[in-house]
Every structure is written in C-alpha cells, then in structure tokens.
Amino acid sequence: MDPVNFIKTYAPRGSIIFINYTMSLTSHLNPSIEKHVGIYYGTLLSEHLVVESTYRKGVRIVPLDSFFEGYLSAKVYMLENIQVMKIAADTSLTLLGIPYGFGHDRMYCFKLVADCYKNAGIDTSSKRILGKDIFLSQNFTDDNRWIKIYDSNNLTFWQIDYLKG
C-alpha cells in the first residue's frame, strides 16, 4: 500500500510523517536520517491535510497528496495516546505562517513537530549541534513512545494489526 492511501485509511490525526525526497535544497546539510517531517492534520472538507515547515514557505498546510510529491521513502509514527495526538494536530494550525529557520521566532520541520507535541505534554529530547539544541528525526524515531506504523521500505503489515486493536 502506498503511503498516501495508508495514511488516509489508518493514520490517526497527529501522526508524524517522515519523508525523503529525490531533490532537496537542505538534505546535504541536514544531519537528520529522515530529511523532512510533517504532522497529519486529518481531514477538513473531505481533504486530507498535513502541516509542515519548508525552506521557501515556512509553516503551512498542504494537501496530503502534495506533501508526497517527489518522495523517495516514507515512515509514519504515532503515540498510544490518540487524544495527545489530536492536541498536537490542533496546535499545528496555530503555528501557520511562521517563517522557516532556526532562530527564536522561526520554525524548521522537526522543531514544528517537537513544539506541537510539547504543547500536548510530550517533551522531545534534542541534540546539541554547533552550540544549539536541534531536533532531528532520530529524536522521534529513537524514542520508544513513538510507534512506527508504516515504512515504505519495509511493507510488512503488522502495523495494521496494531491499529485495528
């Protein structure tokens, strides 16, 4: 199953979606294993939406299909507490329009996710890089609170059994 259909069918609001692209301006400078992340907002007026922060546009909301344009690989993670995930998804909307960057009043994709989940009561550890606390994909994927429910490079569907309960 492709990631878009998987998310539309199984992923709860607030799931975090990691993707790697064929072409990225920042991928060579990015020490993160997964190069980009967004928060699955859910549906609004029958449109599946993702909140992300990009180099050119800052924090924005995009259709799920657009989020995946040009992707190479994808992974989807969730928490056991769906209510916390909903709070994080709702928080992501309050950050729309913040410019991209690493300063105090700026937001890059991994910080977006960390800040949304911090507001929902989930603190994420950071890495100290060049004197700054930076969030990377590893800060989420290495945290055992996060459950991987989809990996486009390993399409075993034990994950679906977990989601069905």
Swiss-Prot record:
Protein's UniProt keywords contain Signal: no
Protein name per UniProt: Protein OPG091
GO CC annotation: host cell cytoplasm; virion component
Signals that turn on the gene: Expressed in the late phase of the viral replicative cycle.
Record's keyword terms, sorted: Host cytoplasm, Late protein, Virion
Compartments reported by the entry: Virion; Host cytoplasm
Role: Contributes to vaccinia virus virulence in mice but not to replication in cell culture.
InterPro entries: Papain-like_cys_pep_sf, Peptidase_C92
UniProt cross-references to Gene3D superfamilies, sorted A to Z: endopeptidase domain like (from Nostoc punctiforme)
Organism: Vaccinia virus (strain Western Reserve) (VACV)
Additional comment: Displays sequence similarity with a group of bacterial permuted NlpC/P60 proteins. Thus, the ancestor of the OPG091 gene might have been acquired from a bacterial source at the onset of poxvirus evolution.
Family, per entry: Belongs to the orthopoxvirus OPG091 family.
Origin superkingdom: Viruses
Keyword NADP included in the entry's annotation: no
